[in-house]
Amino acid sequence: MDVNPTLLFLKVPAQNAISTTFPYTGDPPYSHGTGTGYTMDTVNRTHQYSERGRWTTNTETGALQLNPIDGPLPEDHEPSGYAQTDCVLEAMAFLEESHPGIFENSCIETMEVVQQTRVDKLTQGRQTYDWTLNRNQPAATALANTIEVFRSNGLTANESGRLIDFLKDVMESMNKEEMGITTHFQRKRRVRDNMTKKMVTQRTIGKRKQRLNKRSYLIRALTLNTMTKDAERGKLKRRAIATPGMQIRGFVYFVETLARSICEKLEQSGLPVGGNEKKAKLANVVRKMMTNSQDTELSFTITGDNTKWNENQNPRMFLAMITYMTRNQPEWFRNVLSIAPIMFSNKMARLGKGYMFESKSMKLRTQIPAEMLASIDLKYFNDSTRKKIEKIRPLLIEGTASLSPGMMMGMFNMLSTVLGVSILNLGQKRYTKTTYWWDGLQSSDDFALIVNAPNHEGIQAGVDRFYRTCKLLGINMSKKKSYINRTGTFEFTSFFYRYGFVANFSMELPSFGVSGINESADMSIGVTVIKNNMINNDLGPATAQMALQLFIKDYRYTYRCHRGDTQIQTRRSFEIKKLWEQTRSKAGLLVSDGGPNLYNIRNLHIPEVCLKWELMDEDYQGRLCNPLNPFVSHKEIESMNNAVMMPAHGPAKNMEYDAVATTHSWIPKRNRSILNTSQRGILEDEQMYQRCCNLFEKFFPSSSYRRPVGISSMVEAMVSRARIDARIDFESGRIKKEEFTEIMKICSTIEELRRQK
């Protein structure tokens, strides 16, 4: 039967059909090859927006730098980064006037955080530029390598375990005349395999010592590595994103802590909240503007878009903001917070892997690393690439490009939001001193502006004033991409507002389906996603029921676990049929063991094992959940696990789901091929960290786990904890005297070994 698609929408208000226009079904586009071109684009564009600034040379690194601050005021509508310091400071002062004590209180909160944060805060996050190896690594490994190098160079403040002390080492390291580092390298040799008698390539990993002089070390410490942003939907061109090294991260973290604390107190800020809380905040601002625009006033809303938000932001401006916000605070605190923007005004962008050349006729491929772009003959490149390289050449040093203006994506989301809100704050009548006034919402580079005025001319005047104020602060509202509507219909951070928020269901589409973690987690995540969408995204009961049936079907095909009485033949059907026949209570079998599905939309909150527990045969229960069964996962599973969901836009979300350890919660093994590469040493390090951390968590379960403040090593902390716990257990009769003595003996042995070491 042919369905005319327009019929589907006859009864649906147009705004509810917005979902169908989003590019969120199917696989998102990924980038291949190097990100060098995209990074050069970013660097060149950023300099172009600030081209009328002042050029200077950094005395330490010799890098050319462009400073657009207080540059000429723009005369056209082209994007520009000429922020005016006095305007930014004035905007901050007015923000404080409207929110008395906001900066003061946030500083006090932040100071507390600064003194308590442990250095392991930096292990969060995924890929990080590891300056010791000059490439990306998992955050924990990059931090470990940095600390190891610091210690071997006599920097030991970090041993206290406090982040602030690690940062003291970072500052100290920048004054050193040279830094010794250990780098990994690979040797390949051809050897004959004893078994197959074939020639194979054997790789061995070597470590070698290398000394970096002050200049080279500074360049690495100020380097942001760049990659291409993957899985970005609805865009034709890819773009580059940056990952900073460990020297910068800690400082950025403290600045963002202060900015987050300020954003929490600002009603126009869309960060750091999300989801329903964000919608409530938004709805409040809209309500305020609509109630205040009585019959005499018009109210219009701009769905705003800024041109190249972070390429026109400037770290020097952030420094001015921080200097103002912390003006009555202790010297040490002001210094700690001002280092991040200072490092960013001297940052270097690493150009990535370089270019790949291939000759079709000779079947040759060769890589031109980024370091060579400064000297290579340009005749090998096509026109557009040649122009890029010519433009960027004066800025190149050791394979990195000097990039003083601009911010790179996602580094100071909170702080730049504060800047945006400070303009929205200026819309109050007492500041505009005329008949129009404005308010709105800001979330990083996204904004919605609500303007009220007695007539259309007033609205136009208000928008113009807002636009010009933005220009003074280095923010460029795009006239092409922003549009205006009667208040009541707008879009902000992909939330569509039409007299209330419309569920944009398509955004959730990518998270439906089977995740591919393991049978147990997948079942749990699948039903939780459906449950969450019924709560938050207008997923109706009939559709949810259908989604559930489709999910179960998908799940059975993925894990080849069709019901035991089905005719479908798969690799597993023989085993599953056998189990089905010898099970008395067939309803008790899990879906992944060929059992029936007992889920419906009323019981989605119950883990499948619990749902069927009473229906299971006893011996099945014993096999499924017996900790002595070697196939029951050996990692203890807390009652809640976290899955990382990739929503259609925005950062990966953490989603909690119930987890019950059974024979189905297996963890797949790592791919063997990594064990033959230069990553192997790194992998072993990573596993060692993992083991230490897991052990530590056993001693300090989260319920009783207050971060140890004070200077003791992990081992000392665990030993003293073991002694306390053992004494309590012994006195309350939970353990016997022999066990107690044995524990005490082990503790003493450990301490003895530590002393000998």
UniProtKB/Swiss-Prot annotation:
Q: Provide GO CC annotations from the record.
A: host cell cytoplasm; host cell nucleus
Please list where the region (Promoter-binding site) is annotated. 249-256
User: Which Pfam families does this UniProt record tie to the protein?
Assistant: Flu_PB1 (PF00602)
Modification comment? Phosphorylated by host PRKCA.
> Which Gene3D superfamilies does the UniProt entry name for this protein?
6.10.140.720
A Gene Ontology BP annotation from the UniProt entry: symbiont-mediated suppression of host gene expression
Keyword Phosphoprotein carried by entry: yes
Which keywords annotate this record? Eukaryotic host gene expression shutoff by virus, Eukaryotic host transcription shutoff by virus, Host cytoplasm, Host gene expression shutoff by virus, Host nucleus, Host-virus interaction, Inhibition of host RNA polymerase II by virus, Nucleotide-binding, Nucleotidyltransferase, Phosphoprotein, RNA-directed RNA polymerase, Transferase, Viral RNA replication, Viral transcription
GO molecular function ontology, one term from the record: RNA binding
Main EC class the enzyme belongs to: transferase
Localization, UniProt: Host nucleus; Host cytoplasm
Instruction: Indicate which residues form the motif Nuclear localization signal.
Output: 187-195, 203-216
The residue ranges of the RdRp catalytic domain are: 286-483
Which domain of life does the protein's organism represent?
Viruses
Residues that span the membrane, as ranges = none
Q: Which reaction does it catalyse?
A: RNA(n) + a ribonucleoside 5'-triphosphate = RNA(n+1) + diphosphate
Write down the EC number.
Answer: 2.7.7.48
Instruction: Give the residues annotated as coiled coil.
Output: none
Family membership:
Belongs to the influenza viruses polymerase PB1 family.
Subunit description = Influenza RNA polymerase is composed of three subunits: PB1, PB2 and PA. Interacts (via N-terminus) with PA (via C-terminus). Interacts (via C-terminus) with PB2 (via N-terminus); this interaction is essential for transcription initiation. Interacts (via C-terminus) with human PKP2 (via N-terminus); the interaction competitively inhibits the interaction between the RNA polymerase subunits PB1 and PB2.
Q: What job does the chain carry out?
A: RNA-dependent RNA polymerase which is responsible for replication and transcription of virus RNA segments. The transcription of viral mRNAs occurs by a unique mechanism called cap-snatching. 5' methylated caps of cellular mRNAs are cleaved after 10-13 nucleotides by PA. In turn, these short capped RNAs are used as primers by PB1 for transcription of viral mRNAs. During virus replication, PB1 initiates RNA synthesis and copy vRNA into complementary RNA (cRNA) which in turn serves as a template for the production of more vRNAs.
Protein name as annotated:
RNA-directed RNA polymerase catalytic subunit
Taxonomic source organism: Influenza A virus (strain A/Henry/1936 H1N1)
- Lineage of source species: Viruses, Riboviria, Orthornavirae, Negarnaviricota, Polyploviricotina
Identify the coding gene.
Answer: PB1
